[in-house]
């Protein structure tokens, strides 16, 4: 254990949590560790990751705004001259970025007038914040000693020494890096190290995986796996749908031209892909999958704007990064240029469509889930653009409208407003992807009335999830409705667990008995059934805590992979990290593996086979 300093963000958070006894308000503190110290540390770490995620995202946003405005530093807002303390940082999170510009208070508009509304749930209070503390509850007066290898330097180039106020230190540390150089080849006035999305991904994976043995997956691995998997999935989708037998993308490209397949129809087929990473971690595979799908569209000659007009640019992947070039030059967004605007809008909405419709992830670690969502938002932020035409009012639960408020005067970019982000968080979920209460198959003998009810619930479920993704003004209420529908669908699930099956059978037996009169003998049987059910419910409740407390129900969680009747149909591709294991470490498990997976078992280490398993 290294030296701990009260001024560090982590220690400051830990101490506030302890002095206020906030573990006692958590429903299940045991999920954060085996003892009190570990629980406080884990809760504090999760809170700090949430806050740092927001700050890193905002630093990238700030870099984008400055780049869009030709280096105009008046668009910088994440510094001590704009943010005095943790109170004002909390105000920035929840009263600025989470509130539409025209709904902000007068004092907030005066102080933060040129900061756009983003709509991201990243700037909504998390469940853990709601239960414990917000960032404004941290102590402002504390200082932190400067690291001996600090990047902060004096005007003479020498490293600074001594200590600084923690928040000021954090702002100056972030400002020592260049967050606005994504894809840019311009010479910087100051020699700053570049922090882009890929570098942040590595940082996230190291922060998040240092305790649980997670490995950083090199870009060439995620690129290769996504390229091989998704290209096969695209070919299969086109061949199956169109009755073709194309062997590669070149043949498919020629077939699209020869058959004069409408551009929008070809795009719709690609957009119907469903890709899942069941151990998503920080989202590296999903980001690579996003890039690969856009690259495939470009290669097939179907990458087009909302009117179906093809883009006049080339899209390739190099070093796990999406590279967009126009006339052999790296594309850079110029919001006053109509063609540049068209390309930027198209790339943003292509990413939005793919993330919303095609990419899904699950992880047992809530910190991983938060980081994965952040990485996908960052990918969208790379192509954020200014809207130049007014939009209708936001969606309402009654339907109608579009997903953004109209621009307000005094917005960013001389009356323009930055396009808001969709609610993509619902595609990345927390849970144990290996444990489920319910089988994927539905009930085998569901009566017609039951099938009709299941279909109605599935239709409503799909509708609400689509509605949620498109920025409703009442997100919390929609989330609640979605959870209620999910629980209603569970009534049509087939239990996996034998104890749960037995409990359901006993309840069904009791309900059948209630249809008839009760003799003394039947009353005794009924009483015995009640006692058995009560005992079984108690035992299963204990099992719920031990085994199923974070179970993930694949049968119901993603309505996008349910058919019209509400039955599970699955994903087109499941991708993920191959297991990094030693043969010796699993020798005791080999007999069980052979019994469970005889089709794949070969007795020797083969990570491809174990990855499939």
What does each of the following model-derived ranges do?
Residues 346-362, 367, 419-446:
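P-loop NTPase motor core
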Residues 225, 397-400, 409-414:
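Glycine-biased, low-complexity coil/linker segments
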Residues 239-266, 298-351, 381-390, 415-423:
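Short mixed-charge
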Residues 46, 225, 353-368, 464-475, ...:
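Conserved Class I SAM-dependent methyltransferase catalytic core
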Residues 1-295, 305-309, 333, 358-371, ...:
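Preference for the N-terminal adenyl/adenosyl cofactor-binding alpha/beta module
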Residues 284-346, 436-467, 488, 494-498, ...:
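SAM-dependent methyltransferase catalytic-core segment centered on the flexible catalytic loop
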Residues 47-62, 205, 374-381, 463-466, ...:
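Short, hydrophobic/amphipathic alpha-helical patches that form generic packing surfaces
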């Amino acid at each position: 254990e290294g030296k701990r300093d009260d001024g560090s963000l982590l220690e400051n958070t830990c101490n506030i949590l302890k002095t206020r006894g906030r573990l006692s308000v958590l429903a299940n503190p045991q999920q954060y560790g085996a003892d009190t110290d570990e629980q406080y540390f884990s809760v504090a770490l999760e809170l700090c990751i949430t806050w740092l995620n927001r700050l890193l995202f905002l630093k990238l946003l700030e870099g984008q705004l400055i780049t869009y405005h030709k280096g105009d530093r008046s668009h910088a807002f994440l510094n001590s001259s704009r943010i005095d303390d943790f109170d004002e940082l909390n105000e920035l999170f929840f009263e600025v970025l989470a509130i539409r510009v025209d709904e902000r208070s007068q004092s907030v508009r005066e102080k933060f007038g040129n900061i756009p509304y983003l709509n991201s749930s990243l700037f909504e209070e998390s469940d853990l914040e709601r239960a414990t503390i917000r960032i404004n509850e941290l102590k402002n007066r504390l200082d932190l000693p400067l690291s001996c290898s600090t990047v902060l330097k004096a005007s003479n180039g020498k490293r600074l020494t001594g200590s600084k106020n923690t928040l000021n230190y954090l702002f100056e540390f972030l400002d020592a890096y260049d967050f606005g150089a994504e894809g840019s080849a311009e010479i910087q006035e100051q020699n700053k190290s570049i922090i882009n999305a890929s570098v942040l991904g590595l940082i996230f994976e190291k922060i998040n995986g240092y305790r649980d043995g997670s490995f950083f997956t090199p870009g060439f691995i995620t690129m290769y796996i996504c390229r091989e998997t998704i290209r096969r999935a695209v070919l299969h989708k086109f061949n199956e749908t169109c009755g073709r037998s194309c062997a590669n993308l070149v043949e498919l490209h020629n077939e699209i031209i020869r058959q004069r397949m409408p551009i929008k129809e070809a795009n719709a087929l690609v957009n119907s892909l469903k890709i899942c990473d069941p151990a998503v971690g920080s989202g590296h595979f999903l980001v690579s999958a996003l890039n690969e799908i856009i690259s495939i569209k470009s290669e097939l000659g179907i990458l087009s704007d909302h009117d179906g007009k093809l883009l006049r640019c080339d899209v390739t992947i190099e070093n796990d990064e999406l590279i967009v070039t126009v006339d052999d030059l790296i594309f850079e967004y110029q919001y006053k240029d109509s063609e540049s605007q068209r390309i930027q809008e198209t790339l943003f909405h292509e990413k939005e469509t793919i993330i919303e419709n095609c990419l899904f992830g699950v992880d047992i670690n809530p910190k991983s889930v938060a980081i994965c969502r952040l990485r996908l938002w960052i990918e969208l932020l790379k192509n954020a653009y200014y809207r130049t035409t007014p939009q209708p009012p936001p969606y309402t639960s009654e339907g109608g409208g579009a997903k953004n408020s109209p621009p307000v005067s005094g917005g960013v970019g001389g009356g323009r407003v930055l396009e808001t982000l969709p609610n993509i968080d619902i595609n990345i979920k927390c849970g144990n992807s290996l444990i489920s209460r319910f089988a994927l198959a539905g009930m085998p003998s569901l009566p017609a009335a039951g099938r009709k009810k299941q279909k109605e619930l599935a239709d409503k479920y799909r509708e609400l999830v689509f509605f949620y993704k498109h920025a409703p003004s009442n997100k919390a209420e929609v989330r609640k409705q979605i959870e209620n529908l999910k629980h209603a669908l569970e009534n049509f699930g087939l239990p996996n667990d034998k104890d749960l099956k037995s409990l359901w059978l006993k309840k069904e037996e009791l309900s059948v008995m209630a249809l008839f009169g009760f003799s003394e003998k039947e009353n005794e049987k009924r009483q015995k059934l009640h006692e058995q059910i009560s005992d079984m419910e108690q035992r299963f409740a204990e099992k719920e805590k031990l085994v199923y407390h974070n179970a993930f129900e694949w049968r119901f969680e993603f309505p996008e992979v349910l058919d019209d009747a509400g039955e599970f149909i699955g994903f087109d591709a499941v991708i993920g990290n191959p297991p990094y294991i030693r043969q010796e470490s699993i020798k005791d498990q080999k007999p069980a593996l052979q019994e469970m997976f005889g089709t794949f078992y070969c007795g020797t280490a083969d990570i491809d086979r174990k990855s499939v398993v």
